[in-house]
C-alpha cells in the first residue's frame, strides 16, 4: 500500500514490499512468481469511476511483472526461482502508481494473487494481496496577474487610492483533490494603514465574486463535490477602497494572509 500520497508534492507515488517464498517440500522446486488479477479490469480503483494505472517491478531481478493483461507476462528473460528443500528466498517488489491518473482523494485498490508457477502451468501455491494507493485530501494555491515579490511576499500595488473598485488584474489559482475552504486574514482588520500611525483607509475584498469579511478570519467555501480540480478557472481578486477624504498623504498598506484547507 502506498500511504499518505500528496498529489501536489511533486513526488512519484511508490512503495516497496517483500514476498518470501518457502520450499517446505522434500525436493528441489523451480517456479516463476506471477501476479494475477483477482478481478479485471486492470487498475487501482474505488470500485467505480476512473482507475489509476500502475507498474509492479521485481527489484531483485530487475523485471517488470505488471499484470496489464490480467497476468504477469513470461518472456525468455524471465527468471525462475530455484529453491532446495526447506530453502526460502525473499524478493523485493516496487509498486509505482501513475500520478497523472489520480482523480480525487481516497483509497484506490486492486486485489491480486501472487502465484508460484512451475513448468506446464503447474501451480505450487499462491496467496492473495491488496495493492493500494491512499491519496490524501490536498490543495495548493497561487497568485497570477499584477503583483511583484519582495522578501518572499507578494506585493499588490493598488495605485493612487480612490474610492471605489481598483482596476488591478489579480487572480487566485487553486489546485485541489476535491472540496476546499479558503481563509483570509487581514492584519489591520480591513484597513490600509499609514505606517505605524492611526491614519487608515477602509477597504473590502472579494474572491471569485464572493465578499470576504476582513474584520476577523474570513472564510470562503470552495466548490462542493469530489474530483480533482485544477486552476483552469482562476478566481478573480477584487479590492474596493472606502472613503479616502481628509486622509494624510503617504503610503497605506495592509498584510493579507490567504490559506487553503482541503476537505
Language-model region placement:
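Surface-exposed binding patches on compact interaction domains or structured appendages
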Residues: 27-85, 192-217
Amino acid at each position: 500500500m502506498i500511504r499518505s500520497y500528496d498529489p501536489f508534492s511533486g513526488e512519484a507515488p511508490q512503495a516497496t514490499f517483500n514476498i518470501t517464498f518457502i520450499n517446505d517440500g522434500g525436493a528441489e522446486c523451480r517456479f516463476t512468481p506471477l501476479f494475477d488479477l483477482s478481478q479485471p479490469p486492470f487498475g487501482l480503483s474505488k470500485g467505480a469511476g476512473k482507475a489509476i494505472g500502475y507498474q509492479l517491478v521485481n527489484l531483485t531481478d530487475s523485471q517488470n511483472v505488471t499484470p496489464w493483461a490480467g497476468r504477469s507476462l513470461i518472456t525468455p528473460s524471465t527468471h525462475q526461482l530455484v529453491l532446495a528443500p526447506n530453502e526460502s528466498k525473499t524478493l523485493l517488489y516496487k509498486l509505482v502508481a501513475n500520478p497523472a491518473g489520480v482523480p480525487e482523494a481516497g483509497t484506490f485498490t486492486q486485489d491480486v494473487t501472487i502465484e508460484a508457477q512451475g513448468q506446464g502451468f503447474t501451480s505450487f501455491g499462491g496467496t492473495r494481496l491488496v495493492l493500494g494507493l491512499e491519496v490524501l485530501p490536498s490543495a495548493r494555491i497561487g497568485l497570477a496577474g499584477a503583483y511583484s515579490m519582495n522578501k518572499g511576499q507578494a506585493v499588490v500595488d493598488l495605485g493612487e487610492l480612490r474610492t471605489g473598485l481598483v482596476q488591478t488584474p489579480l487572480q487566485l489559482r487553486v489546485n485541489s483533490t476535491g472540496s476546499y475552504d479558503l481563509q483570509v486574514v487581514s492584519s489591520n482588520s480591513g484597513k490600509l494603514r499609514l505606517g505605524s500611525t492611526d491614519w487608515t483607509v477602509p477597504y473590502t475584498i472579494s474572491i471569485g465574486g464572493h465578499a470576504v469579511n476582513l474584520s476577523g478570519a474570513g472564510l470562503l467555501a470552495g466548490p462542493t463535490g469530489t474530483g480533482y480540480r485544477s486552476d483552469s478557472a482562476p478566481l478573480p481578486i477584487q479590492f474596493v477602497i472606502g472613503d479616502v477624504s481628509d486622509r494624510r498623504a503617504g503610503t497605506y498598506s495592509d498584510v493579507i494572509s490567504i490559506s487553503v484547507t482541503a476537505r
